[in-house]
Amino acid sequence: MRPLAQIFLIGISSLSYAGIEEYYELETVPLPTELAKVANATQVDGLDFFPDGRLATCFVDGQVYTLNPKTGNWKLFADGLHEPLGIVVLNNREMVVCQRPEVTKLRDNDGDGVADEFEVLSDAFGISGNYHEFNFGPVRDAEGNFYFSLGTASSGAGVRYEKRGPFNPLSYMDRMYACVPYRGWVLKITPDGKTIPWASGFRTPNGLGFDLEGHLFVTDNQGDWVGTSKMHHVQQGKFYGHAGSLLWREGWEGRPLNRPVPELDAIRTKAAVLFPHGAMANSPTQPLVDSTGGKFGPFAGQLFVGEMNKGRIMRVALERVRGGFQGMCIPFYDGAGLKRGNNRMVFGPDHSLWIGHSNHGWAGERGLQKLRWNKKVPFELKSMS
């Protein structure tokens, strides 16, 4: 019996299931030739589709281009932006972009495919000049509200003499700090133009997204106060763990680091998902719900999450437990030609997944790729409970 068992096990091991690339076709998309000539200019930090099928793409040096996927032709829509990190298309002539100093609406008034008007939707937050004060987003809910998230500053660099907004030195030069409002927060812009500080406690919340029911999620990157990278269900007024942002919470007094950890932990809302550091993700990015209704594979309603350090896209399945969310994470597409720096994603009209790559001087790569399901069902773990 023993030799037969050994032979049987060897036979099973030799029939290992196919890699994910057997079920999804990966394609690298050529970028604008004028950007390809400039070092690091082809970092893609925002993607969305127009109703007419064009792709809107923002690049790290401040350009927004549109791509006609049928012809492969690129056209410059706008430039002069400051490190744009996301796009929401409103219609065939308008889009909203998050750039470092503001959330901006770009409008093509005459229909020639070039933005004529730049409108500030919100600049109701502080800027100290620290390099790490990113502005992530936006995303838009069914009621027309926009949400965006602000990164904290890094002790790896200081602040500028001229700042925007009030300066609070109580957290200055902590590992990651929020010396101006509302660093480490998610903010909401209402349809009538009000900016509302929505939730606090984030370190580097590089990625916002909704599930199919309209619940808002944000990822956060590992570091001080964030033992491993996480994904949170964002709700108004909640605090999610990074203490620096508490300086701008109404009624807060004193230096957050001087408060006992049990006191801070008592007001913290726990994450929905933890990404094991190194094994799963070091720098998770945008969560994107599979809204294709099964046309991208058997994962409808689950979330795909990018990762900067690896050539990996993760998959997250959530469930409701005692009024909150908890979930599992698993690698979805790992290696097999996928670049690192998977910073922004969007589903196209043909239900393929478009992926923008970036590095910002750290881990990652540059470029634009897309994944297309070939209709074969992969041998994968679908969900847990």
Each predicted region: which residue ranges?
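Positively charged n-region of N-terminal signal peptides that target proteins for export
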Residues: 1-5
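Bacterial N-terminal signal peptides
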Residues: 6-14
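Beta-propeller domains with acidic blade repeats across secreted/periplasmic ectodomains
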Residues: 18-385
